Amino acid sequence: YIKFAFLTGVTKFGKVSVFSDLNNLDDISMRKDYVEICGVSDQELHENLDIELHEFAETQGLSYDKLCTKLKEYYDGYHFTHNSIGIYNPFSLLNAFKYKEFGSYWFETGTPTYLVKLLKKHHYDLEQMAHEETDAQVLNSIDSESTNPIPVIYQSGYLTIKGYDERFGIYRLGFPNREVEEGFIRFLLPFYANVNKVESPFEVQKFVREVETGDYDSFFHRLQSFFADTTYEVIREQELHYENVLFIVFKLVGFYTKVEYHTNDGRIDLVLQTEKFIYIMEFKLNGTAEEALQ
């Protein structure tokens, strides 16, 4: 007989009828007993790959501790229920050991085009994604993508559990690690801004160089070009569109500089710090520069 059969996939499927055998499946997605079943814990990493960690550190020219910290930043961070240990993405982790390089291994196995279409369809505020709050019923829902894209994005592995309010049964979500966050935000850029997929990585590089050298004129000229050729459909959601583009740009710049980004009542406040310069910016729709300085 079969003692334990394990089925895994991306999103949940519905129970087709009251007579279906599939109705007897036990969903273990958020069960504490199984939180480590699909990944690698920090303890397992050090107990089984300690020699490889030292070799990886030597290849990268890093100390052992810094290498471990960077691995955790890039590939750790998955939590499948509240108050659970962090889990490494095994595919990315093992490829990093294989090539001894920090790459976007899992992200490059598939493109989240469908998820981006969901976000745009529902006019989703991208800044909210980093601190979305919801309950277990929504996270485990099957067809809620028709009104809410978050369950599908969570089930696909682009968001994970970051915190839990036990009193209200509310989960706080966020990106699990840098590989997923940077990869997903980079993927979003051509879908929201006036830039093609080939040029996108170079545009981010130019943004960073311009703020680091104090060339703010070129920086803002490049930023304005991202809003060119905005379609009529987008104009109807103009304020949200501008906020989303600015969020993407400064989130990407923030991977290489220090950025504090806040939104409030149609206004965006930003502090951007490099080694030589500190920029304080305020963006306001349908307002003048003088009004923003008040």
Identify what each model region corresponds to.
Residues T257-K276:
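Catalytic centers of nucleases
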Residues L285-Q294:
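Catalytic cores of nucleic-acid endonucleases
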Residues Y1-Q238:
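Phosphate-binding site recognition
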Residues S225-K258:
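Acidic-basic catalytic patches of nuclease active cores, encompassing PD-(D/E)XK
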Residues L246, L270-L285:
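Conserved catalytic cores of phosphodiester-cleaving nucleases, focusing on short active-site segments
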Residues P151-L159, F247-K251, F255, Q294:
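Metal-dependent nuclease catalytic cores in nucleic-acid-processing enzymes
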Residues I2-K3, V152, D265, K276-I278:
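Coil-to-beta-strand transition motifs
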